[in-house]
Structure formats: C-alpha cells, structure tokens
C-alpha cells in the first residue's frame, strides 16, 4: 500500500501538477493507494505520524521539494522514531537530494523508479542539536553565507517567478550578491573526535553535508555519499573578497579544484561540534532559523528509503 503526501505549493504548484499526472498513472496501473494534500508543515507532520500509526506497513511517498522532505523526515524522527519506509518524488526548485539519489525530476519516471524497487535502501541523515532545537536533514546544514542566500531567496518574490518558468534552481544565484553584502565573517570553532579544536577567525561559509550538492546543484564536495556513514564539513574563510569569489567560481566548474584552495578546509567525520560567538542564520534543507551564540552538535542517523 502506498500513501502519497503532497505539498501542493511546492515548486510554485509543480507538486500539484505532478500529482495529477501520477494519480492518472496509478489508476491506469490499478495500483491501490491513498493520498493527502497538506496545508502546512505542521499539518504534514501531524498527518504523517497519525497515518503511520494507523497503517504501519504503508510506504509513504512525499511529493514536494527538499523543504517538504525535511519536514517529513523530522515527522518520522521526532518525538520518537517511527519505523517508516519513505519514498520521494521531487517537485521543488532545487531538488539537490534528488540529484544525489539519482531520482528523475520527471514525475512519471520517478514513479516508475519507485515502483520498480522491491526493497528499501538505508541512507544516512545528518542530525543536529542546539540549546533549543534538534532535527535531521537529508541534504546539508549551513551557517553563514549559504544560509544567508537561502534566507534571502525564500523571502524573494523572484523565486516564485522563476519556478513558474521552471528555472527555480537559478533563484539562489540571483540572490548571491545581496547575500555577499549582508553576510559578515564570524569566529568559528570546530571540534572533531580525537583532534584538538580548530579555530577560524574569518569563517564565511560553513556547511555540513550528507551528499555532494547544495544551492540547486552546485557540487560542494563531490566525494560525499548518501550511504557512506559520514558527514563532511566544509569551511571557507573570507580574508578578502577576491579570494572568496575565486573559490566560489571554482566550485561552479568541474574538477573540484576549489577543494585545493588555502581558504577552504574540509573534514569527513561521524560527528562534530561547532561553536560560534555571534548569532548566525542557519539553513537546513532550505529551511532557515537563527542560531544564537553557542554550540551546535552534529552526528549521523539513518532512514529507510525506496525510490
């Protein structure tokens, strides 16, 4: 039994249109299913947990973007972990998780991929905890510059306009220079198991990733995998503007040459601690919040998927 949960506003209505196509295909296949259209992230969480308890052997298929997937994963993880198999049909603007997991962005092809699988896969999730919140993520968590881009993009009418033209992944690029002006460098301490703390006095971008991509397909760390049991931390310092821009430009080019830059540091680990002395915007799978000065703990969790 498949239960589809659709965020009709994802991708500026793309999820709703995709569901129309998928439902038609399901009827043609005479495949037993049910569905639910969410009205908010809170509604999604409440419905998923309630339905999972009523129908424990159901496969839940999410139609939405990376943000919708984030809320579904946290509904499963909190307050107590549910034993749920999760499917996913990408209908957002960036779709970084879909790219990493090699899920087609064509709804009928994504459905065919899902139905062809006979057994679930166990994939890694990142888990984070601060003094006042905790959560899991399938893509990445960022402090500083990338979070600033996401914050500006999410509050920009241009994102919806680009989504209408199927150019949603370019929404982040359009807010790049505004974020560059707004974000300031900050002091950051990174603590890894069995290593002394590492201090950065001019941190500008700090991203913990579970897979290669962020920002709508930019390859941050090409070697990252969804099933390697590890998180990768990337820190870029901005000691001058030209140096930072050159590193970011290299990130957009093939070859991963940005990883050779002196201002970039990366670490692969199963858990870590970040400490800041100033408030920072944080983005998690494209959702943002303000992180007060303090400690941010991260480690690996896992979730069963089928796609």
Regions found by a protein language model. Give the residues of each.
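ATP/nucleoside-binding phosphotransfer catalytic cores, i.e., glycine-rich phosphate-binding loops
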Residues: 192-195, 200, 219-221, 225-307
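Short glycine-rich anion-binding loops that position phosphate/pyrophosphate groups of nucleotides
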Residues: 65-68, 91-94, 143, 211-212
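Hydrophobic/aromatic beta-strand patches that form the interior of the parallel beta-sheet core
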Residues: 36, 61, 87-89, 206
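Short amphipathic alpha-helical segments
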Residues: 16-18, 73-76, 99-101, 219-220
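Catalytic core of DAGKc-family lipid kinases
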Residues: 78-202
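ATP/NTP phosphate-donor binding region
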Residues: 1-63, 70, 74, 108-111, ...
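Glycine-rich phosphate/pyrophosphate-binding beta-alpha loops
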Residues: 146, 205-221, 288
């Amino acid at each position: 039994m498949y239960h589809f949960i659709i965020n009709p506003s994802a991708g500026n209505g793309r999820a709703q249109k995709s569901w129309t196509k998928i439902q038609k295909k399901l009827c043609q296949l005479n495949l037993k299913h049910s569905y639910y259209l969410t009205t908010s992230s809170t509604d999604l969480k409440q419905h998923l947990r309630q339905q999972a308890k009523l129908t424990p052997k159901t496969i839940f298929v999410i139609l939405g973007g990376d943000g919708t997937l984030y809320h579904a994963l946290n509904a499963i993880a909190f307050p107590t972990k549910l034993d749920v198999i999760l499917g996913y049909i990408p209908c957002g603007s960036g779709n970084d998780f879909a790219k990493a997991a090699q899920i087609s962005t064509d709804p009928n092809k994504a459905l065919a991929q899902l139905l062809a699988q006979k057994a679930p896969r166990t994939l890694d999730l990142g888990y984070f905890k601060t003094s006042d919140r905790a959560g899991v993520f399938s893509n990445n968590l960022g402090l500083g510059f990338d979070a600033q881009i996401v914050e500006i993009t999410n509050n920009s009418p241009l994102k919806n306009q680009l989504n209408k033209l199927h150019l949603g992944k370019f929404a982040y690029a359009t807010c790049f220079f505004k974020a560059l002006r707004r974000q300031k460098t900050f002091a950051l301490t990174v603590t890894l198991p069995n290593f002394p703390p590492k201090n950065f006095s001019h941190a500008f971008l700090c991203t913990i990733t579970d897979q290669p991509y962020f920002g709508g397909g930019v390859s941050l760390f090409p070697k990252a995998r969804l099933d390697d049991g590890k998180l990768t931390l990337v820190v870029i310092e901005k000691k001058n503007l030209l140096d930072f821009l050159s590193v970011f430009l290299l990130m957009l080019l093939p070859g991963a040459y940005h990883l050779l830059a002196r201002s970039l540091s990366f670490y692969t680990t199963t858990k870590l601690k970040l400490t800041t002395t100033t408030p920072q915007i944080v983005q998690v799978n494209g959702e943002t919040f303000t992180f007060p000065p303090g400690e941010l703990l991260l480690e690996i969790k896992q979730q069963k998927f089928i796609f």
